[in-house]
């Protein structure tokens, strides 16, 4: 809906003091963007992975609804990203690989089921910057992060930001904890 897009852009441009431009098509968003961040509640992929350009990073935020699908309340898994995006990604990272098996996010589980990508080729967020994950090895690589459950990295970042804002605003209370040497050694 053009009015919703325009109203959203106006409201959040003012709120965050950034320019938000409403567009008509996914192609307009993807073309020339360094980062494509998806945060919806859809069960239909948002764009065709063939539109991706070298060097782009994609993040998919949508959570799983696999239990609703298995119990018959929904006919398909939620997914923002299509199979082609998963295929084209040179590096795929999720928060915790195990959640691909337990939560079955459509964005990754379906391409794995179809044999388009391999579970073993997906890295965990905590592996980035270690010998376990090569990370981006070329500026031309397309990278994809699927925000799955099960990793406190994002929670820690949010908590740190909340702490900084509260501290800057003079809010909150400082709690004293026992020093490690004062704690019982056996539990």
Task: Describe the function of each predicted region.
Residues 1-16:
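NAD(P)-binding Rossmann-fold cofactor-contacting core
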Residues 43-45, 65-66, 100, 152:
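Glycine-rich nucleotide phosphate-binding loop and flanking beta-alpha elements
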Residues 51-137:
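Rossmann-fold NAD(P)-binding glycine/threonine-rich loop
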Residues 28-35, 42-59:
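Rossmann-fold NAD(P) dinucleotide-binding segment
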Residues 16-20, 139-140:
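A short helix-to-beta-strand connector/capping loop
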Residues 3, 7, 113-187:
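NAD(P)-dependent dehydrogenase/reductase Rossmann-like domain
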Residues 18-28:
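Short acidic-hydrophobic, aromatic-tinged amphipathic segments that line or gate anion-handling sites
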